[in-house]
């Protein structure tokens, strides 16, 4: 199974179209969106081609393959226009012997972790900064960065998981980091 993880679109039609192209090219079995889909939020500048209505149409076209969690900029009004669930605070994906806990990062993160077992993975967006860091009880924190508003001079990016390997990629599809899950 191949999964694609993306976070923090923040209403950018330009980057939603890029994501749509990536999904077509990567051909994942599921795309996991880590929140902050339509609204840019009060702390961010407007992203390139800010157009939440167009982003809604693009994402609704992908609805059969999307699993999404709620970000701090997502609201009930967003759920009214999106045709797939977006209001869950987290999802748990069994990958081999581990659980991958996917969330946005504003509620559960390395400072306030969910109830992880030894060796489980916490995967979230929110910071707009790619990450792969050990923490807790032999746990790992992963972050794909942001599709539309990367921070700390990082690339616009996303992440895939295939055959037990997480791969961080730029929006041009170029890999720049890998982490292999050990069972």
Region locations from a protein language model:
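Short, well-ordered secondary-structure micro-motifs
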Residues: 42-45, 78-82, 88, 112-113, ...
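Amphipathic repeat-derived elements
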Residues: 1-13, 28-30, 93, 141, ...
